[in-house]
A protein has these predicted regions:
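A charged helix-plus-loop insertion that forms the helical arch/lid used to bind
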Residues: 79-90
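Structural signature of FAD isoalloxazine-binding scaffolds in flavoprotein oxidoreductases
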Residues: 157-162
């Protein structure tokens, strides 16, 4: 009899990360990563199906369910994607499309909900009843774990923390968001690259400037690499984004009084170069007692948290446990 598996898919604004877990542990048995930029909706759906099929073949089948984490707002009443800022998924009932295509039950949730489900149940915030999470990538995803459960809002539109306005007259937000001054416009991976680009144009004779002159692409990992080597432009870009993040954290502390704030996503590879300035601003702006007892931590599972959280939702679905997310089953 084939071993049983579940698959988790973390579909981001620039790439897909998917992996299979065994029936009982957190070991990622096989994984795949694929770019998603520039795809149409049909192309994206096909690419996702191909990635799941690749993993299924690699682990020898026995797939009980597939979980998806997607940076999108879903209407829990209809299963429709109603706000997909960085992906071509507007007005698609993703679970209903994927379940018959894959031939197994699927569960679909916002990607940050998957992140926080992982970190609050088996990760850095395990044991805490109230947790706030922000994932810093192309944009900023948000997740809330309140009173021991993922909070999604009345119809699924809750916890869009990246679209908290922190500057009423700030720069326009990205993608389909109509707002100005959203947190993700100043504290995301996109904002980090923008800050570094503006700074290096004024100070080209630095390690970052020389790296770009040599043909390296300006990315978050490059900025982190050179910041760790002491490059002043890279360090200041991370500190600028960290301070903006601290404003967002302070607002969330004043509203939710969580035990733990978890920061995940690709930008968290910068570690304390990002978190130290964030904590400093948070302590100046948040109120006591919330600011005095909170922990602000990097996600334990790093960039795998969304994928693992989606797989854990799939495991719940396969076991008949309530997921609170959108479920789909093959005909």
């Amino acid at each position: 009899m084939a071993a049983r598996h579940v698959i988790g898919v973390d579909l981001g604004g620039t790439k897909l990360l998917a992996g299979a877990l065994g029936a009982d542990d957190l070991t990622v048995i096989h994984r795949t990563s694929r770019p998603v930029l520039g795809l149409t909706q049909n192309q994206l759906v096909q690419m996702v199906a191909d990635a799941v099929q690749e993993i299924s073949v690699a682990v020898g089948g026995g797939i009980d369910a597939v979980g998806f984490g997607i940076p999108c707002t879903f209407d829990l009443r209809t299963g429709m994607a109603i706000q997909a800022v960085n992906l071509p998924l507007h007005d698609i009932a993703f679970a209903d499309v994927m379940a018959p295509r894959l031939g197994v039950p699927v569960v679909v949730d916002n990607d940050a909900n998957c992140h926080i489900y992982c970190e609050a149940t088996v990760g850095i915030a395990s044991g805490a009843s109230d947790v706030v999470l922000m994932t810093l990538g192309t944009g900023i995803g948000g997740g809330l774990f309140l009173c021991g459960e993922v909070y999604r809002g009345w119809i699924g539109g809750g916890a869009e923390l990246g679209h908290m306005v922190v500057d009423m007259d700030g720069r326009p937000c990205q993608g389909n968001c109509p707002n100005r001054g959203c947190l993700e416009s100043v504290a995301s991976g996109t904002a980090l690259v923008r800050e570094a680009s503006l700074a290096v144009a004024k100070q080209p004779n630095t390690a970052l400037g020389r790296a770009l002159e040599a043909g390296r692409e300006l990315t978050g990992p490059l900025i982190t690499e050179l910041a760790n080597g002491g490059d002043p432009v890279a360090l200041e870009a991370l500190a600028t984004v960290g301070r903006a993040l601290g404003v967002g954290i302070a607002n969330l502390l004043n509203i939710f009084n969580p035990q733990v704030v978890v920061i995940g996503g690709g930008v968290i590879g910068a570690g304390e170069l990002l978190l130290a300035p964030a904590r400093e601003v948070m302590r100046r702006r948040a109120l006591s007692p919330a600011k005095d007892v909170v922990r602000v931590e990097a996600a334990r599972f790093g960039p795998d948290a969304g994928m693992i959280g989606a797989a854990l939702l799939a495991r719940d679905l396969a076991a008949g446990r309530p997921t609170g997310a959108i479920e789909g089953r093959p005909a």
